[in-house]
UniProtKB/Swiss-Prot annotation:
InterPro entries: DNA-dir_RNA_pol_bsu_ext_1_sf, DNA-dir_RNA_pol_bsu_external_1, DNA-dir_RNA_pol_su2, DNA-dir_RNAP_su2_dom, DNA-dir_RNAP_su2_hyb_sf, RNA_pol_bsu_bac, RNA_pol_bsu_CS, RNA_pol_bsu_protrusion. It catalyses: RNA(n) + a ribonucleoside 5'-triphosphate = RNA(n+1) + diphosphate. DNA-dependent RNA polymerase catalyzes the transcription of DNA into RNA using the four ribonucleoside triphosphates as substrates. The keyword Signal does not apply. The RNAP catalytic core consists of 2 alpha, 1 beta, 1 beta' and 1 omega subunit. When a sigma factor is associated with the core the holoenzyme is formed, which can initiate transcription. GO terms for biological process: DNA-templated transcription. GO terms for molecular function: DNA binding; DNA-directed RNA polymerase activity; ribonucleoside binding. Keywords: DNA-directed RNA polymerase, Nucleotidyltransferase, Transcription, Transferase. It comes from Aliivibrio salmonicida (strain LFI1238). This is DNA-directed RNA polymerase subunit beta. HAMAP family: RNApol_bact_RpoB.
Length: 1342
């Protein structure tokens, strides 16, 4: 395997055995691809904005004299970049301009004569843009649009499984679901009549729809039934016979032909009888005359002479009818073929229940059902029915829906119209009847072939279309009313409804969520989340077990492990590592193709439907060298069932062992040894890990840490290879390799790093360079680590030395005992950044002012403010300190303009202003790291704002100048090379000013041309940078667009350092969570024979019942990994030669039969030194899930570094020095500190706010609430008979208003008595009883 320069710095030992056929695809592609599809111009008009415009335009006026056509659209550049939007609190969006054409027809000339055409670009609101990392910045905060899993449009056949009717009879139904439009349901009732519902309204006989489609009774019967023909001969009836139709019937008469009796009367007709009849080619048999009684006529039989109908279609025959028919001379009689087994008379019965006779009555019936109470007219009824399923404006199946519809009813082609036609409706009814007759299966609604993903782009497009449709109505009216000669397209379009619809979707849709930004993994997982909730989806309350359950088709598409615990379980899923969406929105997963028993490297992506019938082997099937299966029988899956299949039958094989699970679950080493419930907790808790001060890579990982860190976008990744030219804390400059240059560019890439920024969860985002000047980098190398990444690998926690043993009850019930050393070394110290803002508004009584001149505040309180009244950067503040001084005018009377003027001149302020400064919240203390001041346009900036502005300008200038100098240097270096080639001496060049080089003329024409080109580039570069600086200057100095009534906003950023302390929640990666019970001095912790104390003591009882054995294996493996580091340190101490290090490392990397090949000999001496330096803390190990290190490899590695193979060490008690009775499992586990910190939860109150109605204290920290003394607590005091304590609890300490104020007063006066009165909640109870009409009066006891 080839390692890049930065990967060589720390090579992770991989224990995986299966070859890697396919790299994990880019993790955020589901978001980025979908949104790109939305905003990129699609010439076909199938997707995105283009599709939305084409579906609404052209808009015709009502009178047909004019129309507005759509030509094209373009998105301009956004005004601010992403970072500026976040700072200013605005949306990162681009203005949408649409070219429209207004065509006016001449009404006097012949139809279609054009009188005038006007084209114009019209502004149609702002479209929020996606950042490179798949998020949106809406009002300054990063949000994610979660993809939705919804029922695919199409037709679904289902049954009630016998639950509806008391008899337990299974009732079948069919439902046609369009992408937009009315739902059409067909259903059977217990009497086997077929009914139709539109939009879940009341049901009508299904034949009404057919009548409305201009079908007569005869045509309807013709569509659904086969015929049986009888011939009348004298006194007998001959019946045409198809033997197959007799199966399962009981003969009511002897079935004979040519004197041979085939079936005797009363016998059941079997398959043997049918074979005999077929063999003898019996086509006609004689039947008794009464056999026809009760059969149904297939069409009207008319008396030719009189014209009267003898028997109408769908009427049952009687003997009398038969006589009349033979009298009228009808010799052939056709009846419907029905039986109870597999040809039910459902449609025939339904027709009898159907009261309508012709199309009009059917349309009226539909109209009455859809619009009850409105008088139906013929036109209204017709237009309503047409618009339901046959109008492209109101109904659309979509391409997916049509494809699913056609495949459901058995058509071959996947194309067709977006609307229904009569054949579609008839086919659906036919298929439903077939299913009722026992042919065909009902659909499985939870199959992933019937559920599709709706991603950002599609949802945004739908929302945009909603806005356009609102505009369409207004445009129509304006076109019909306005003066068309004077009107321009601009005057017709009002962009407000469009931007309102888009804004509403991005700002407040259920699927637009505040991004979970705890750490890189939580970001990635949030963007890959698939929710079944949301508009058009399920609701928590209605979703049953089946929807939430893991389905066989989830394999490789949705993760069976990662889903929230609680009410949303199974409704919110995560995309599996390799899954992707196909063009129809169905999830696909990759498989290796098997051709002629050989497993090839070719990969096919299959959707759940395509996968259906294939036999698919698992990724861990054993293969020979040639790529054939080693075993005769292979464990494989077919139609969702696992079983043993002969190797010749296998058609596909899984791509990777982790293709079943999501990214978060793939990060858990030894996942295969954990119980699923705990794995679920482990996967979910990794997302809550807080980035620590110094990230520490996991010693035991799974090998995909690098992939997650890079794809998450928190690291700076090289776009092109080259040489690192300069590095400082905030920027990295790379000189690009010659071969990767675009002709005519300077060849310098500049990466600006993010420093100490606040995340959505108030954690700290900070990037640190990992490269040094002069180092070579290749494309895709990590240049700077972000939060929770270490040398480009995801690092959510810290490797801690752990012992599994009880310790004086301090690890009872999952508590965790931690050594003081962990606190001293700041292993779990985290930085949290809070944003506090102060807003100065314009009030009725005058404007608020930000100032250091605050009434009745001492000097000490103002010591940290500057003259503008804003705290200075670097100040250490604690709860209650003033951050921004602000005064608000308080006035009992509103001032007259004259008084206002006098006040303005003489500045009498102090008397009538109150202090409304921004103070630090009570429980917070920290350091001010940044201040931002936003001033409204037209309001004078204060001194601090100007200082900040100057500083920003200076920084921007420095940035742009440096960037220019670097690029200029690169360009001039090329000029110098050119000049020296042309023979100019270097001494002469050095004597000149560098810019004069461009003015030199050369003899050689081609060289002169090159020089001129470079000179031109130089001028362009200079002009570009001047323009860049001017733009930046304008952005910095212009006023800010603030909300109405806001004059000034000051944002103060406060950094808080949180050390680990008792009450904080910690967890491993295997769902083993606990709360810190005590920080123990190092000297009291258990230590081993070398005197090395452990960092954390965990309870061994937390393992067996939870069945997450992965943590034990991780601890053993961690011990071995650390052992390698210790061994290297020992060798360094002994100052051994380099070749011994090489040999030892080679031995380590060669251990076990793995796919990884590391050739230490190929590394240079410096590279080996760097590698050893980075491995001193321990050898990082990858054990991929389901393909991890076996027990033997762990033992082998432990043996190699001279540690006991049991993984257990002899420990001594730190307090007494005595050895513990038996060896203890000691090793290294990767521990996370979760974002459930005791500082955020602890809260105290003596008095505070009360609820309005009950007058009881509120609950919770956010409301500054008290503790609730609930029902059970009252019982406890009752049980003890503590009457006075109870009385105090229920009155003066809770909701006895007078009692509690009196008590407060008494305490102030030093009098410690209390007089309980009437609790307010009792008054509330009285009021509630009175509201029920029962009067209650309280009697005073005299």
């Amino acid at each position: 395997m080839v390692y890049s320069y930065t990967e060589k710095k720390r090579i992770r030992k991989d224990f995986g055995k299966r070859p890697q056929v396919l790299d994990i695809p880019y993790l955020l592609s589901i978001q980025l691809d979908s949104f790109t599809k939305f905003i990129e111009q699609d010439p076909e008009g199938q997707y995105g904005l283009e599709a939305a415009f084409r579906s609404v335009f052209p808009i015709q006026s009502y009178n047909g004299n004019s129309k507005l056509e759509y030509v094209s659209y373009n998105l301009r550049e956004p005004e601010f970049d992403v970072k500026e939007c976040q700072i200013r609190g605005v949306t990162y969006s681009a203005p949408l301009r649409v070219k429209l054409r207004l065509v006016v027809y001449d009404k006097d000339a012949p139809a279609g004569t054009v009188k005038d055409i006007k084209e114009q670009e019209v502004y149609m609101g702002e479209i929020p843009l996606m950042t490179d990392n798949g998020t949106f910045v809406i009002n300054g905060t990063e949000r994610v649009i979660v993809s939705q899993l919804h029922r695919s449009p199409g037709v679904f056949f289902d049954s009630d499984k016998g639950k509806t009717h008391s008899s337990g009879k299974v009732l079948y139904n069919a439902r046609v679901i369009p992408y937009r439009g009315s739902w059409l349901d067909f259903e059977f009732d217990p009497k086997d009549n077929l009914f139709v519902r539109i939009d879940r309204r009341r049901k009508l006989p299904a034949t009404i729809i057919l009548r409305a489609l201009r079908k007569t009774t005869e045509e309807i019967l013709d569509l659904f039934f086969d015929k049986v023909v009888f011939e009348v001969k004298d006194q007998t009836l001959m019946m045409e016979l198809l033997p197959e139709r007799l199966r399962g019937e009981t003969a009511t008469f002897d079935i004979e032909s040519n004197g041979k009796v085939y079936v005797e009367a009363g016998r059941r007709i079997t398959a043997r009888h049918i074979r005999q009849l077929t063999k003898d080619e019996v086509n006609n048999i004689e039947v008794p005359v009464d056999y026809i009684v009760g059969k149904v006529a297939s069409h009207d039989y008319v008396n030719e002479d009189t014209g009267e109908i003898i028997i109408a279609a769908n009427q049952e025959f009687s003997l009398e009818d038969l006589a009349n028919l033979s009298q009228a001379g009808h010799k052939k009689i056709e009846v419907l073929f029905t039986n109870d087994l597999d040809h039910g008379a459902y449609i025939s019965d339904t027709l009898r229940a159907d009261s309508t006779v012709d199309r009009l009555s059917a349309l009226v019936e539909v109209y009455r059902m859809m619009r009850p109470g409105e008088p139906p007219t013929k036109e209204a009824a017709e237009s309503l029915f047409e618009s339901l399923f046959f109008s492209e404006d109101r109904y659309d199946l979509s391409t997916v829906g049509r494809m699913k519809f056609n495949s459901s009813i058995g058509r071959d082609n996947g194309e067709g119209a977006g609307i229904l036609d009569e054949t579609d409706i008839i086919e659906v009814m036919r298929k439903l009847i077939d299913i009722r007759n026992g042919k065909g299966e009902v659909d499985d609604i939870d199959h992933l072939g019937n559920r599709r993903i709706r991603s950002v782009g599609e949802m945004a497009e739908n929302q945009f279309r909603v806005g356009l449709v609102r505009v369409e109505r207004a445009v129509r009216e304006r076109l019909s009313l306005g003066d068309l000669d004077a009107i321009m397209p601009q005057d017709l379009i009002n962009a407000k409804p469009i931007s309102a619809a888009v804004k509403e979707f991005f700002g407040s849709s259920q699927l637009s969520q505040f991004m979970d930004q705890n750490n890189p993994l939580s970001e990635v997982t949030h963007k890959r989340r698939i929710s079944a909730l949301g508009p058009g989806g399920l609701t928590r309350e209605r979703a049953g077990f089946e929807v939430r359950d893991v389905h066989a088709t989830h394999y490789g598409r949705l993760c069976p492990i990662e889903t929230p615990e609680g009410p949303n379980i199974g409704l919110i899923n995560s995309l599996s590592a390799y899954a992707r969406c196909n063009e129809y929105g169905f999830l696909e997963t990759p498989y290796r193709r098997v051709v002629d028993n050989i497993v090839t490297e070719d990969v096919d992506y299959l959707s759940a439907i395509e996968e259906g019938t294939f036999v698919i082997a698992q990724a861990n099937a054993v293969l020979t060298e040639e790529g054939t299966f080693a075993d005769e029988l292979i464990i494989a899956r077919q139609k969702g069932e696992s079983g043993l299949h002969p190797r010749e039958h296998i058609q596909y094989m899984d791509v990777a062992t982790n293709q079943v699970v999501s990214v978060a679950a793939s990060l858990i080493p030894f996942l295969e040894h954990d119980d699923a419930n705990r794995a679920l907790m482990g996967a979910n808790m990794q997302r809550q890990a807080v980035p620590t001060l110094r990230a520490d890579k996991p010693l035991v990982g799974t090998g995909i840490e690098r992939c997650v860190a890079i794809d998450s976008g928190v690291t700076a990744v090289a776009k092109r290879g080259g040489m690192v030219q300069s590095v400082d804390a905030s920027r990295i400059v790379i000189k690009v390799n010659e071969e990767e240059l675009v002709p005519g560019e300077a060849g310098i890439d500049i990466y600006n790093l993010t420093k100490y920024t606040r995340s959505n969860q108030n954690t700290c985002i900070n990037q640190r360079p990992t490269v040094l000047p002069g180092e070579p980098v290749t494309r895709g190398d990590v240049l700077a680590d972000g939060p929770s990444t270490d040398l480009g690998e995801l690092a959510l926690g810290q490797n801690m030395r752990i012992a599994f043993m009880p310790w004086n009850g301090y690890n009872f019930e999952d508590s965790i005992l931690v050594s003081e050393r962990v606190v001293q070394e700041d292993r779990f110290t985290t930085i949290h950044i809070q944003e506090l803002s102060c807003v100065a508004r314009d009030t009725k009584l005058g404007s608020e002012e930000i100032t250091a001149d605050i009434p009745n505040v001492g000097e000490a309180a103002l010591s940290k403010l500057d003259e503008s009244g804003i705290v200075y950067i670097g100040a250490e503040v604690k709860g209650g300190d003033i951050l921004v001084g602000k005064v608000t005018p308080k006035g009992e009377t509103q001032l007259t303009p004259e008084e206002k003027l006098l006040r303005a001149i003489f500045g009498e302020k102090a008397s009538d202003v109150k202090d409304s400064s921004l103070r630090v919240p009570n429980s917070v203390s920290g350091t001010i790291i940044d201040v931002q001041v936003f001033t409204r346009d037209g309001v004078e900036k204060d001194k601090r704002a100007l200082e900040i502005e100057q500083m920003q300008l200076k920084e921007a200038k420095k940035d742009i100048t440096e960037e220019f100098q670097i690029l200029e240097g690169g360009l001039l270096a090329r000029v110098r090379t050119l000049l020296t080639l042309a023979g100019t001496s270097e001494v002469k060049l050095d004597a000149m000013d560098r810019k004069q080089w461009l003015e030199i003329t050369l003899d050689d024409e081609s060289q002169q041309n090159q020089l001129e080109q470079l000179a031109e580039q130089y001028d362009e570069l200079k002009a570009e940078f001047d323009k860049k600086f001017e733009t930046k200057r304008r952005k910095i100095t212009q006023g800010d667009d603030l909300a109405p009534g806001v004059l000034k906003i000051v944002k103060v950023y406060l950094a808080v350092k949180r050390r680990i302390q008792p009450g904080d929640k910690m967890a491993g990666r295997h769902g083993n969570k606990g709360v810190i019970s005590k920080i123990n001095p190092v000297e009291d912790m258990p230590y081993d024979e070398k005197g090395q104390p452990v960092d954390i003591v965990l309870n061994p009882l937390g393992v067996p019942s939870r069945m997450n054995i992965g943590q034990i294996l991780e601890v053993h493996m961690g011990l071995a990994a650390k052992g390698v580091g210790d061994k290297l340190n020992q060798m360094l101490k002994e100052q051994q030669e380099l070749h011994k290090f090489r040999n030892f490392l080679q031995k380590v990397y060669d251990l076990g039969e793995t796919r990884q090949e590391v050739d230490i000999a190929a590394l240079s001496d410096d590279e080996v030194r760097t590698l050893v330096k980075n491995l001193r803390g321990g050898l990082p190990i990858a054990t991929p899930i389901f393909d991890g290190a076996p027990e033997s490899s762990i033992k082998e590695l432990l043996k190699l570094v001279d540690l006991p193979e049991s993984g257990q060490l002899k420990l001594f008690d730190g307090r007494t020095g005595d050895a513990f009775e038996r060896p203890v499992t000691v090793g290294y586990m990767y521990m996370l500190k979760l974002n459930h910190l005791v500082d955020d939860k602890m809260h105290a109150r003596s008095t505070g706010s009360y609820s309005l109605v009950t007058q009881q204290p509120l609950g919770g920290k956010a409301q500054f609430g008290g503790q609730r003394f609930g029902e059970m607590e009252v019982w406890a005091l009752e049980a003890y008979g503590a009457a006075y304590t109870l009385q105090e609890m229920l009155t003066v300490k809770s909701d006895d208003v007078n009692g509690r104020t009196k008590m407060y007063k008494n305490i102030v006066d030093g009098d410690h008595r209390m007089e309980p009165g009437m609790p307010e909640s009792f008054n509330v109870l009285l009021k509630e009883i009175r509201s029920l009409g029962i009067n209650i009066e309280l009697e005073d006891e005299e």
